Design a protein with these regions (language model features):
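Bacterial N-terminal signal peptides
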Residues: 9-21
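Sec/Tat signal peptide C-region and signal peptidase I cleavage site
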Residues: 22-26
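Outer membrane pore-forming secretion/assembly proteins and partners of Gram-negative envelopes
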Residues: 27-205
Length: 205
């Protein structure tokens, strides 16, 4: 009478062990995915018809971006003016605020830049390839606008500067990994220029 009970107990024990192992293996990819980290590279390109400075030359990694822009816009020159490198985890959020690192700007009236990136998630696309989805993205700048001039007590001429906010915001972006992607464009204070925002997401191994 005890033998069937013993066999049943052994079978039940083995079943529980097998179930635990199956659950553990099933959860491993999810855990690995949730712990993945990524580099967020945001770059600002300025398109114009003026001669580009060699110090702001577009790197080879953005050559495909410039080629695509040339097919849609008639600007003769493109230059890289700002680069921001941040780090984020899968399903994470990112917020950056700071003084722009754009060259040749007025040190007494700098440009302030900020961008936010919410709910970055690694998920397969329609072809089964890993891609990045972003729930919301915003890029903004506070740019100085000269509104008037005045002279101080010494007779020196000074500018009156007010700051205006410009930017773009969007929801539900999809990007391929390791691929520079044009997010959008903004006008600048110059009528013959256009600013392009380029975003690249790279996995950190």
């Amino acid at each position: 009478m005890n033998k069937p009970k013993f066999i049943f107990s052994i079978a039940a024990f083995l079943f529980v062990c097998l179930l635990s192992l199956t659950t553990s293996f099933a959860q491993t990819p999810v855990r690995q995915q949730s712990e993945s980290s990524y580099e967020v590279l945001l770059q600002v390109l300025i398109a114009s018809n003026t001669t580009a400075d060699k110090s702001t030359a577009v790197p080879q990694t953005l050559s495909s971006v410039v080629t695509k822009l040339r097919t849609n816009y008639s600007f003769s020159n493109y230059r890289l003016t700002s680069t921001y490198l941040q780090r984020i985890a899968n399903r994470g959020n990112l917020e950056f605020k700071g003084v722009s690192n754009e060259p040749n700007q007025d040190i007494y009236a700098p440009i302030f830049s900020e961008f936010t990136l919410g709910q970055l998630t690694n998920s397969p696309d329609s072809n089964g390839q890993n891609s990045i989805s972003i729930q919301n993205f915003r890029f903004g700048r506070r740019v100085p606008i000269k509104t008037a001039d005045y002279k101080d007590d010494s007779g020196k001429s000074n500018a009156v500067v007010n700051y205006e906010s410009v930017g773009l915001a969007m929801q539900k972006l999809n990007l391929s990994l390791n691929t520079p992607t044009i997010i959008g464009n903004l006008s600048t204070s110059k009528t013959d220029e256009l600013m392009f925002i380029v975003l690249t997401i790279k996995p950190i191994k």
